[in-house]
Amino acid sequence: MTEPLISGTVYPIQMLDKKGNNMTKQALVPVANGSEEMEAVTIIDVLRRAGVAVTVASVSDSKDLKITASRGTYIVADCSIHDCAGKAWDLIALPGGVPGSQHLAESTVLDQLLQTHVKELRLLGAICAAPAVILGEKGLLADKTATCHPQFYQSMKAKEVDTESRVVVDGNCVTSQGPGTAIDFALELVEQLCGVVKREEVASPMVLTTSPTAYY
């Protein structure tokens, strides 16, 4: 039986300035065994629709880049998180899932990347368990209003926990609640990274609706 594989290896055409410098936005999406697949794949897909160069990195110490997501879906990363060490990213976006979020939190390489990323005021996104288990526990939400999966409302260490909003933007930090808000979250990342026009351009062919009655 063939294993179902989701691999992210198609990159957008590079955008170069007049001096030949690469202007394509660069995003890092770390994944681990137990990451939430709907969130991970939605983030990757929507960002790539916007022309963002997305690198999917496994935090596993294994040389095998295949991870098993929270519902048994196999995802093949582009590289190991060790290959990303010391690089600057326009965006780091963290999918949730349990125990995936905990595995991401335990990665020393990812921790170093996150600490530098936050100090440089670069765009940071986290959804579901990730805001609480990763960002909150590392003290990266101490001055932020944020949201997360309802299961973690009481334990999330943030300046303020927003339990009403599907997506919360506070400065350079974007957080969201879970699988059902993943598209909203990913589109907000597109808007923050590439502008509202690009968000609308990406959203239009996705046949999105905000009205439940539209389905009946």
Question: Predicted regions: what is each one?
Answer:
Residues 2-6:
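Extreme N-terminal basic, low-complexity initiation segments
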Residues 60-78:
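N-terminal beta-loop-helix "entrance" segment that forms/cooperates
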